[in-house]
Amino acid sequence: MCETASRTLPPGITPISGDEARRLIHHTSGPELEALLDRAEAVRRAVHGDEVALCGITNAKSGRCPEDCGFCSQSARFEGADAPVYPMIGAGEIVEQAHKAERAGAREFSIVASGTRLAREQELATVEEALRRLRAETAVEPCASLGLMREPELRRLKDAGLMHYHHNLETARSHFENVCTTHTFDEQLETIRAAKGLGLKLCSGGILGMGETPEQRVEFAEEVRDLGVDCVPVNFLNPRAGTPMAHLKAITPEECLAAVAVFRLMMPAAHIFVMGGREVNLGDRQDLIFRAGANGTMVGNYLTSAGRAPDLTVGMVERQGLTLRPPDTGKAWAFDGHAPSDADWNRKAAEPRPRPLPVVR
């Protein structure tokens, strides 16, 4: 899904400075916001054209995470959280979900697992098998989001067919300890740099609306920019019951759009994806994410919450006069221009999931 963030920019397109970003991040109303969105859209069109990439995911292992990330319902530390709890699903189910996402228009498909890192050799072997099958049986570009990882593990996954590695910074360094205390900001950087050293495409962003200031949103964008990542997923907090951040008030749609636009102007070459929380925080203004400079979004469900039906997401893209970007794997794409409706997408919801593990508090 993601090309190099160091691509040559068209004449006249240069990243804005941090100082300018700190000024523009406050342009959240009236003519100032309109001008900011117009500027971001012009940069998006000049650098990325009118194609939008969709990403699908599978929650391959859920719950019982030992970390204390304050936004996450999968933490075992939060008694009131209600995320599903189950062990790593099989490679066959991962591939089945990838086929489903591909038919819905996904260009990239990510295998996501809860926890600090993969805890067992068998889990790593399952992901390896799934990656080999994804490359053989689908056209999607395989991605994984498996927590903190070392170079030898990442190399095994790359050899199995991994194209992209996703690991969010989550927030600015100055705000990180307010979000998580069980691992450090620098540990996250180590994982990202290990993936980059292997030549994997990098996907790293975070969540806005976790109590950070507008200036810290810019600080966060500067840190992501300096890593030279290919894709920047921008999420907005969707407060989950039982988590320490359940009480936080959603940031306004205007704040969301201004942040996306500033990120686009700071990182013209990066692929910027508006992901989780867009339905809750933007509501009927979701269509404006592309005017704000985004050139990608999620299709289907999130990790522990429902997303829009795929046909609504594809329709949102098409209403803006944009088209879906196919994978770069050189294989025939299963998307035929008709994304499934909500009824089709959730047809298998009643089928049994893997046997849940008991919740250990």
Swiss-Prot record:
UniProt cross-references to InterPro entries, sorted A to Z: Aldolase_TIM (IPR013785), BATS_dom (IPR010722), Biotin_synth/BioAB (IPR002684), Biotin_synthase (IPR024177), Elp3/MiaA/NifB-like_rSAM (IPR006638), rSAM (IPR007197)
Gene3D superfamilies: Aldolase class I
Pathway involvement of the protein, from the record: Cofactor biosynthesis; biotin biosynthesis; biotin from 7,8-diaminononanoate: step 2/2
Domain Radical SAM core: 47-278
Cofactor note as given: Binds 1 [4Fe-4S] cluster. The cluster is coordinated with 3 cysteines and an exchangeable S-adenosyl-L-methionine.
Residues given in the record as [2Fe-2S] cluster binding sites: S110, C143, C203
EC nos: 2.8.1.6
Presence of keyword Iron: yes
Keywords from the UniProt entry: 2Fe-2S, 4Fe-4S, Biotin biosynthesis, Iron, Iron-sulfur, Metal-binding, S-adenosyl-L-methionine, Transferase
Positions with a binding annotation for [4Fe-4S] cluster: C65, C69, C72
Top-level taxon: Bacteria
Alphabetized CDD domains for the sequence: Radical_SAM
GO terms, biological process: biotin biosynthetic process
Heme is among the record's keywords: no
Reaction(s) this enzyme catalyzes, per UniProt: (4R,5S)-dethiobiotin + (sulfur carrier)-SH + 2 reduced [2Fe-2S]-[ferredoxin] + 2 S-adenosyl-L-methionine = (sulfur carrier)-H + biotin + 2 5'-deoxyadenosine + 2 L-methionine + 2 oxidized [2Fe-2S]-[ferredoxin]
Record-level Gene Ontology MF annotations: 2 iron, 2 sulfur cluster binding; 4 iron, 4 sulfur cluster binding; biotin synthase activity; iron ion binding
SUPFAM superfamilies reported for this sequence: Radical SAM enzymes (SSF102114)
Quaternary structure note: Homodimer.
PANTHER family: BIOTIN SYNTHASE, BIOTIN SYNTHASE, MITOCHONDRIAL
Family recorded in the similarity comment: Belongs to the radical SAM superfamily. Biotin synthase family.
Protein's name in the database: Biotin synthase
Source organism of the structure: Anaeromyxobacter dehalogenans (strain 2CP-1 / ATCC BAA-258)
